[in-house]
UniProtKB/Swiss-Prot annotation:
It comes from the Bacteria. One of its GO terms (cellular component) is cytosolic large ribosomal subunit. This is Large ribosomal subunit protein uL30. Part of the 50S ribosomal subunit. InterPro entries: Ribo_uL30_ferredoxin-like_sf, Ribosomal_uL30_bac-type, Ribosomal_uL30_ferredoxin-like. PANTHER family: LARGE RIBOSOMAL SUBUNIT PROTEIN UL30M (PTHR15892:SF2), MITOCHONDRIAL RIBOSOMAL PROTEIN L30 (PTHR15892).
Length: 63
């Protein structure tokens, strides 16, 4: 396993209700659909961009 690849732990802390449709789709793309659901993803540029778009709904931790 390559130890040079960083991962981030993302937890949804706020609801997507009342948010724009593209923000809801971004959460689904990250694998999040319920409050307090956590996913661990590779820290790539595409993931960073998605996280930046909905960062107000998430808690982000580096691993």
């Amino acid at each position: 396993m390559n130890n040079n690849i960083n991962h981030i732990k993302i937890t949804q802390v706020k609801s997507a209700i009342g948010r724009k449709y593209d923000q809801r789709l971004t959460l689904v793309g990250l694998g999040l659909n319920k409050i307090n659901k956590t996913v661990i993803l590779k820290n790539t540029n595409s993931i960073k961009g998605m996280v930046e778009k909905v960062k107000h709904l998430l808690k982000i931790e580096n691993m």
